Design a protein with these regions (language model features):
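Sec-dependent signal peptide recognition
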Residues: 2-8
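C-terminal motif of bacterial Sec signal peptides marking the signal peptidase cleavage site
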Residues: 15-16
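C-terminal, non-catalytic "cap/extension" segments appended to globular domains
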Residues: 23-50, 57, 217, 239-240, ...
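N-terminal helix-rich structural modules
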Residues: 23-219
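Short, hydrophobic/amphipathic alpha-helical patches that form generic packing surfaces
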Residues: 91-101, 160, 164, 267, ...
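Active-site-proximal, well-structured secondary-structure segments within enzyme catalytic domains
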Residues: 158, 190, 197, 201-243, ...
Length: 704
């Protein structure tokens, strides 16, 4: 069974009449075999009223499956215990995958209410499984005899991961501590849900309304048109609205000549859920941090970070801080140089003010234009969304022989979605890929990959192929122009598509190990390595076509992009690592305490030496990755994986061919297809033939 219990979830009135219950059960699409093409979820049939009954039935069904494993009188072995557990929970996986994906991408009040009921239900059920003494006793019997069972590598790995999940889930705790552990998990499930809901409410709650045309000075036409359309949507015709969605606030901060308005929008962005109102997250953070510490202590770890990292490649907080330090020092040095360049420009222009954090985007863009004669708006017309998407598909075709066919008449959870059939070079089905591109009030911010169906292939049964989703928040079409991406968005598309390939190309027997079920600091390797192809001149010429003329991006412009590729890397590196440090500082606390969140963050950044012109990429109260998300004590993973991805791409460069088939096949076989069937570093060494060093990362960022 997969780690299928995302801790979130619901309020719904359940019909009490037995006949009505029977009717609801019969009509609930989750209980039927999906009949839509390729077995994708029947979004056209699923209604909010179906979720809670389906969750309750799925939990009940899974309980019965666990009881059957426990009641089996045969001697515990791999098949009747470990594999049986992996096979269990099919309905719960199905319901959870749909519900939580929709919760993130297209939520509403009803779904949010449902989530509040389901979160504790799932937490309690998860604990009931992990702390089932009779079940764990059977797992221990199998683990004790593992050397005599002649297990395959994958079977041995599944046994290892299953045993570890029980131990890390509290199975070895005494009865009284188990009850405390369960209560902590239930409380955390609700707090993490509340954090995310608060952040979404704050993000949606702010609008910068502009009613004077002169206040639009400096903004590109596409940005102005999009703001006018947003105002029209909000029944404010003749005005312009800028929001806290990235495609809105980033271009405003980059191009607006109105410094006071840049400051207003920026402060609204970085003060989300820090406004001492009903959506404030400071007390939520306090509770989450202290409950996590208490949970780690119960399991014998001195801090939450020590607990989390024990199951990662990094292993210890010290190793994480050491890596951060190696990149932080040159990154901060470069950031100070960049800040000086911008302050010098302010002085040259007659400015009488000091560079502030809300000035960075504006002046860095001006410096880029001055140094490299490159304006982001100059390249945007060459990055039409559908062409960029096709570029990513072409890279996958050249590397792995994959083909992508857009499907029509497929059930969608939102009209913005596109769906693709992905086939291998021999024509066999690889899987189905959903892509959801644009921001909306019902969608959380950021970009991510999830599964609607995991891949697995049990002995003697058909290979179940995955249904994968890539979700984004890209710039929408504006006026008569299609969706035109900036280069950051181009890299984001390639990044999430890399995650998608990891989920699609997996070839595992067991659901628990398939796809992205790998160490957290390894999971970003397939995504980040894909970003390298996005900027390769050979690839740019495949997809970067002017949306009006069809002209391929000129070599002169490609040269500018490459030359400016390391521009602003001090800022990019430092703001990211500042957030990683903040995450680690919260989660290396070893003593329960009342945390003054603002003071804690200030002290953390001062200790690290962060300059005042830069704030962490995510401040505490909207740090969605680590408080409700799955990256607590793990935001460093992106830089850890960058050590791997920079070294991995070097393997192609060493061959003189970015599409070298020998290297691509090795990466597919040893990384993408393997899922979590092998220890992460072993997978990497099997591909690369050596462990990675940090030098390629520093070189890529221009920090060497």
């Amino acid at each position: 069974m997969k780690n299928w219990l995302p801790v979130m979830a619901l309020t719904f009135v359940i019909v009490s009449c037995s006949n009505e219950k029977k009717t609801m059960k019969e009509m609930n699409p989750f209980y039927e075999t999906y009949t839509a093409p390729f077995g994708v979820p029947p979004f056209d049939k699923i209604e909010n009223k179906h979720y809670l009954p389906a969750f309750k039935e799925a939990i009940s069904r899974h309980e019965r499956e666990i009881e059957q494993i426990v009641a089996n009188s045969a001697k515990p072995d791999f098949a009747n215990t470990i594999e049986a557990m992996d096979k269990s929970g099919e309905l719960l996986n199905r319901v959870s995958n749909v519900f939580f994906n929709v919760k993130e991408a297209n939520t509403n009040d009803s779904i949010d209410q449902i989530a509040e009921v389901v979160a504790p239900l799932l937490s309690q059920h998860n604990d009931a499984v992990n702390m089932n003494d009779k079940l764990f006793a059977k797992v221990k019997v199998v683990d004790d005899q593992k050397d005599k069972l002649n297990l395959t590598r994958e079977q041995a790995r599944l046994l290892e991961e299953t045993y570890k999940r029980f131990v890390r889930g509290g199975a070895n705790l005494p009865a009284d501590k188990k009850e405390i552990f369960k209560k902590i998990n239930t409380d955390l499930s609700l707090l993490e849900l509340k954090f995310g809901n608060n952040m979404l409410a704050e993000t949606n709650g702010f609008k910068l309304v502009i009613d004077k045309k002169e206040d639009l000075a400096g903004l590109p036409e596409t940005v102005v048109v999009a703001a006018a359309e947003e105002a029209k949507t909000n029944k404010m015709d003749g005005k312009w609205i800028f929001s806290l969605q990235k495609p809105s606030w980033i271009p405003f901060l980059t191009y607006s000549q109105k410094r006071d308005l840049r400051e207003k929008l920026y402060k609204a962005m970085y003060n989300r859920s820090n406004n001492n109102n009903e959506f404030d997250n400071k007390s939520v953070i306090n509770k989450i941090v202290n409950l996590r510490l208490q949970k780690a202590n119960l399991l014998g770890f001195e801090s939450w970070a020590a607990y989390v990292l024990d199951d990662c490649m990094a292993k210890t907080p010290k190793n994480v801080y050491d890596l951060i330090g190696k990149v932080w020092t040159p990154g901060l040095k470069r950031a100070k140089e960049e800040a000086k360049d911008m302050q010098d420009m302010i002085v040259r222009e007659g400015g009488k003010f000091k560079l502030e954090s809300w000035d960075w985007w504006f002046y860095s863009e001006k410096v880029r234009k001055e140094k490299y004669d490159l304006n982001e708006e100059e390249v945007r017309p060459y990055f039409e969304l559908n062409k960029v998407r096709e570029g990513a598909f072409t890279v996958a075709n050249k590397l792995y022989g994959l083909t992508f066919k857009q499907l029509q008449n497929i059930p969608l959870y939102h009209p913005d979605c596109q769906v693709f059939e992905v086939d291998d070079k021999d024509g066999s089905l690889i899987g189905i890929l959903y892509m959801d591109f644009f921001p909306r009030a019902s969608k959380k911010g950021g970009a991510w990959m999830n599964n609607y169906r995991d891949q697995y292939h049990y002995e003697g049964q058909a290979d179940v192929r995955p249904v994968v989703s890539n979700t984004f928040n890209f710039s929408k079409p504006a006026g008569d122009k299609p969706a035109l991406l900036n280069f950051d968005e181009v890299e984001t598309l390639f990044h999430e598509f890399g995650h998608g390939l990891h989920g699609l190309l997996t070839k595992c027997h067991y659901r628990t190990l398939s796809g992205t079920s790998v160490a957290r600091d390894f999971v970003e390797l397939p995504s980040q390595v894909m970003e390298h192809w996005a900027v390769e001149p050979e690839v740019l010429k495949m997809y970067a076509k002017h949306y009006k003329t069809g002209e391929t991006i000129p070599q002169k412009l490609v040269d500018k992009i490459i030359k400016a590729g390391k521009f602003n890397q001090g800022f990019i590196t430092t703001e990211f690592l500042a957030a990683a440090i903040l995450d680690m500082d919260y989660h290396t606390i070893t003593k329960a305490e009342e945390i003054d969140v603002e003071k804690f963050e200030k002290n953390s950044m001062e200790k690290a030496g962060l300059i005042p012109e830069i704030i962490p990429r995510y401040r505490s109260t909207y740090f969605n990755h680590v408080f409700p998300g799955g990256y607590s004590s793990g935001y460093y993973s992106y830089i850890w994986a960058e050590v791997l991805d920079a070294d991995a791409f070097e393997a192609f460069l060493e061959k003189g061919n970015i599409f070298d088939q020998e290297v691509a096949t090795s990466f597919r076989k040893n990384v993408l297809e393997m899922g979590g069937t092998e220890e992460a570093m072993k997978e990497y060494v099997n591909f690369r033939g050596k462990t990675p060093g940090i030098e390629p990362l520093l070189k890529n960022r221009g920090l060497n």
